[in-house]
C-alpha cells in the first residue's frame, strides 16, 4: 500500500465567524475553493488538499492553542515557487496576519524557503517552497537542527 497524500485537515477554532474571514481570504488566495459552509464550519478544497474549519464546543475546550501541547504543532502548505511565498507574505500583510518569521531560507534542506504565521487563534501555519525533490533529492539529508 502507498499513501496518496493527506486528504484533509480539520482545525478547531474559538470564533468561527472571525476564523471564516481569515481562512476564506487565505485559502482562496492559495487556490482552494469553498465547497461547504454552515453556521459552525467551512470546508475548502483544492490541489488535492482539504481544510475544514470548525467551531469548538466551549465546554470541551482545554484552553488556547499551543504548538507544544499534544496534537498539532503546525500546518504547512507547499507552494510551487519562491515567488509564491513572497506573494503570500504580501497578502498576509494586507490581512494583518501575525507573521512570526519570514520569508527566509530554512536550514532543513537546500533551497527551503518559507513564512511562518498564525491564524486568529494562534494556530501556527507555514507556507514553503522546496526546490526539486527536497529530502528525496540524491545526497540530501534532512537537517533537524532548525527551529520549527
Regions inferred by a protein language model and the residue ranges of each:
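Vicinal oxygen chelate
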Residues: 13-18, 75-121
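Long, continuous compositionally biased terminal/linker segments
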Residues: 45-80, 86-90, 94-95
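Core segments of cupin and vicinal oxygen chelate
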Residues: 10-55
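Short glycine-enriched loop/turn motifs at secondary-structure junctions
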Residues: 3-5, 68-72, 109
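N-terminal beta-strand motif that seeds the catalytic metal site of vicinal oxygen chelate
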Residues: 1-20, 75, 131-148
Amino acid at each position: 500500500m502507498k499513501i496518496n497524500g493527506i486528504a484533509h485537515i480539520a482545525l478547531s477554532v474559538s470564533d468561527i465567524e472571525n476564523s471564516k474571514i481569515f481562512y476564506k481570504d487565505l485559502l482562496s488566495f492559495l487556490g482552494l475553493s469553498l465547497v461547504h459552509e454552515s453556521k459552525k464550519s467551512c470546508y475548502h478544497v483544492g490541489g488535492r488538499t482539504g481544510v475544514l474549519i470548525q467551531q469548538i464546543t466551549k465546554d470541551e475546550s482545554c484552553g488556547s492553542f499551543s504548538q507544544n501541547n499534544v496534537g498539532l504543532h503546525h500546518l504547512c502548505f507547499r507552494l510551487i515557487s519562491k515567488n509564491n511565498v513572497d506573494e503570500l507574505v504580501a497578502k498576509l500583510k494586507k490581512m494583518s496576519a501575525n507573521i512570526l518569521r519570514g520569508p527566509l531560507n530554512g536550514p532543513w534542506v537546500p533551497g527551503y524557503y518559507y513564512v511562518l504565521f498564525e491564524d486568529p487563534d494562534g494556530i501556527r501555519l507555514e507556507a514553503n517552497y522546496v526546490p526539486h525533490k527536497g529530502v528525496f533529492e540524491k545526497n540530501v539529508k534532512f537537517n533537524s537542527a532548525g527551529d520549527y
